[in-house]
Amino acid sequence: MFIDTVKDPAFWEKVRSDETYRPMIDTLLAEWEKCETAEIAEIPYTVAADFFHSGDRVKGERYFFMRRTALSVSAVLALIYPEERKYFDRMQDFIFATCNEYSWELPAHIPNMIDYIPDDIDLFAAETGFTLAEIYAVFGDRLDPLVKTRIKMEVERRIINPFADYNRKFAWIGYRSNWAAVCGGSVAACFIYLAPERFAEVKPRIDEAINNYLSSFQESGYCLEGIVYWDYGFSFFSSYAQLVSDFTNGEVDYFKMEKVKTIATFARSRRDE
């Protein structure tokens, strides 16, 4: 199982010693140089709201993506080098900062600021929930108790409870695009990691989203969104497919579907060209 592998110290010892992983580690350490000194201050309102006044996405999203990158980089380095406290401490700082954000949704995805609901779920709210839930599952009691509490509380408030409310409508469930896979797979991961006993109640919604996503592909395995969004959507689909297979002891196995095999083969054929 994936979660058992990443919780096993022997796996990370292999990562440290196997030269195959060296390029990945070098990339992470290069990113760390920026993450180590990155500002954790609260995103100013004028920056977050700038999109609604100027249409400029860059200012607000720069803060957003810097935090997500720093969180992920710090988390992986904390697993590779558990004896280096600086990575772990930085990760917890960014976890807390992320939990303190007013919204996990990008401003460009918010219909308007007047009627906005902070627990709406877009691509990046779902991804953020997935990241925090997986950190919770992987690090477990290594996390400070308050950090664990904040993760669980915020993911429940922003992702799990809203999605479990069938009176709430999420348009992306019906999208035949990467949105259905990224949002659906990420939301499902939040349930599996933090509220496994509730996964069955939302599985019909997840199934609908994933089926709509798979229906967006041509017979060749190509999607009309292009190769970049093919990669984006299928990476999240694959993560969910592995997670739900582990969770159901193989009862749900998307990787056995011929269509999924065709989609995966399409990418390989493109890379061989």
Feature locations, PLM:
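Internal amphipathic alpha-helical repeat/solenoid segments
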Residues: 45-63, 107-118, 168-175
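Carbohydrate-active enzyme catalytic cores, enriched for enzymes
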Residues: 239-273
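Low-complexity, Ser/Thr/Pro/Gly-enriched N-terminal "stalk/linker" regions
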Residues: 2, 6-7, 13-52
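Non-membrane alpha-helical segments in proteins
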Residues: 65-80, 93-97, 126-137
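Alpha-helical scaffold elements that line and support the substrate/ligand-binding pocket
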Residues: 71-74, 78, 187-189, 230-246
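Alpha-solenoid helical repeat scaffolds
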Residues: 80, 101, 138-142, 193, ...
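Active-site lining segments of carbohydrate-active enzymes
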Residues: 113-228, 236-239
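Helix-terminus loop motifs that line ligand-binding clefts
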Residues: 40, 85-120, 217-229
